[in-house]
Amino acid sequence: MAFSGALTITDLDDFLTPSQACIIPVRNNKKPAEDEGPTEIHIDSNNNYYEVSTYPSVGHDDDIGNSKKALEKAEINLNDCLACSGCITSTESLLITMQSQNEILEFIKTNPTVVDPESPCHKPRLPILSISPQTLASLSAAYATASSRPPIPLLVLLRRIRAFLSQPEKGSWRVWDTTFARHMSLRESVVEFHERKDKKEKGKAAEMPMLASACPGWVCYAEKAQGDMLPLLSAARSSQGIIGALAKSWYGHKLQHKPDEIYHVTAMPCYDKKLEASRSDFYSSLYSTRDVDCVLTTGELDLLLQELGFDPHVPIANESTPSYSATEDSPFPELLTHEGSSSGSYLQTIIHDVQRSHPNPTRIITREIRGSTDNIEYLIQDTITGQIVFKGAKVYGFRNLQNLVRKVAKETGIGRSGRGAGAGKLSAAVAARRRKAKTAAPAATSATTSAEGTDVESIASLSLVSGEDKKLDFVEVMACPGGCVNGGGQMKPTVPTPSAPEAMEVDEEGYQRPLPDDGVAVAVNGGSNNVGTGTVAGMEEGMRWSTKEWVAKVEDIYWTGLPTPPASPPLTASNVNGFAPQVKTNGTTNGQVNNGVDRNLQSDQLAEEIIHEVCGDDASKRWDFMRTRFRKVESDVLSSGGVTHEAVKW
């Protein structure tokens, strides 16, 4: 099992092997009665525990067992763990393994496909499987590698899985993808961004920059270690949160099914999504059910399909025929494309909205921070006035995430009460670098004015200076390096088998894991990765159990047959200081028009209809349907002694 780095890095018992022993004692909030006397604990032959009074009752001088009371067994569930900062690898990792392909197989066995007339009380639950596009891309890459065939297009693979699982003997599943839910999440993110921006422009206290919250690993880290930054997190539900609400609240109502009469499963690229599904905001106390009953990782879905006998290369009728509206198989448009990143395109959606709403033409300028494609800044510049109207960033991986936390704390003042002595020196160094850039920029401009194309370079160089002073407006944050396509639950690359069988590691899903467990194999100068050896040349920390080549392959398949996102800018002479100017107008850039049908516009209309059907004009219902809340976790271990995670010295 592979949690994101943001989850495991914050805990003191990070190197302990998984254990069922929780380090936090179970609290008993029940107050003893005032007239209670001394008691003893008795254990019977069946290992049941009883509390027995040592005072004999009237008329029972020799019988002290008449007042015994059965004791309830103390239990710790996933909700308790999410509200505790004591550990994460030792308890939650065991509890979330209960959500696996074995649970789905058991459900298929016990859930009748038709109503039993002799058992009218036992109504079968309607099974729904929602698959993320990152999962489909990873499965396609794995199937192509195993069979030496071309990758299966995502739409074709989705429909083959749907046709297979819809068979009665396989469970009669409804199989969807999650891109329409992502579309609704992106729309809500734009609405929330405007709300915050309007508050800021009116001079009110606004929680800026807005930080994307679709990554549960980042959210869990923020709640447990960076609680002061929670107001900055976007309240918009992730695609999983919204598809869960759609399945239980909207689709179930259309079919006259109560929420507890639907069994909803999602297939996601990471284990952390299991934690997200267990949050209290996604639980209905009225029906005692969650929006998502079980979360499978990509690897677990693959194991499930294997056990059921799925052959991904068996074609079905009309598998490649595009659909432009909701069908009987899927009530939502299939596999919507959102230009930007394979991790949800949250930043790109905000950028497009800013460009459309700005009165003048704009250009996008990008810069890789320290040459990393996982840490890129985006500036939107007014081409007429030269003003920087927006500054955003894409931040993937825990190392970059920590730098982001420090940067945001510096810009906003959040969580800076405990600044160390070195903070002032760092600020002075940053200020000196900015002064140097400002004085050097005019010289660079005048020295290159005669060269062809240097007007663009000069603008980019000057924009770098003004961009340094501009504060962040929005950040797309993901805990995994490479984003969601490199999630811990994705399919893993095939590697050479070592000669000694005992040298091969096997993870919980049964996959062989010969790669070093704390790095990514990177070929050097075209050489081999030396997989299976004790060391790997050019190993990059963070991309656990994967390689850059494999992640790039999954990324490529993700966009196969879809509009390709803008490539990361190369560091060339025409790309001064790592900036790549891209001139854009205010026209729509990410619309999908097929046979005269704008799929995104069509999806916008469907989203509005669904929200109105579920919420009506009730703003409170709409908020609960589309958004969520975050809660700062007060540490039972560290904070009780006045020590924070950041103050711990290793």
From Swiss-Prot:
GO annotation, cellular component aspect: cytosolic [4Fe-4S] assembly targeting complex
Keyword vocabulary terms for this entry: 4Fe-4S, Iron, Iron-sulfur, Metal-binding
Family matches, as SUPFAM superfamilies: Fe-only hydrogenase
Domain of life: Eukaryota
Record-listed [4Fe-4S] cluster 1 binding positions: 22, 81, 84, 87
GO biological process, one term: iron-sulfur cluster assembly
GO molecular function ontology, one term from the record: 4 iron, 4 sulfur cluster binding
Residues engaged in binding [4Fe-4S] cluster 2: 215, 270, 480, 484
Keyword Lipid biosynthesis in record: no
One Pfam family it belongs to: Fe_hyd_lg_C
Gene3D superfamilies given in the database record: Fe-only Hydrogenase (Larger Subunit), Chain L, domain 3 (3.40.950.10)
Family indicated by similarity: Belongs to the NARF family.
Function noted in UniProt: Component of the cytosolic Fe/S protein assembly machinery. Required for maturation of extramitochondrial Fe/S proteins. May play a role in the transfer of pre-assembled Fe/S clusters to target apoproteins.
PANTHER family: NITRATE, FORMATE, IRON DEHYDROGENASE
Protein name: Cytosolic Fe-S cluster assembly factor NAR1
Gene that produces this protein: NAR1
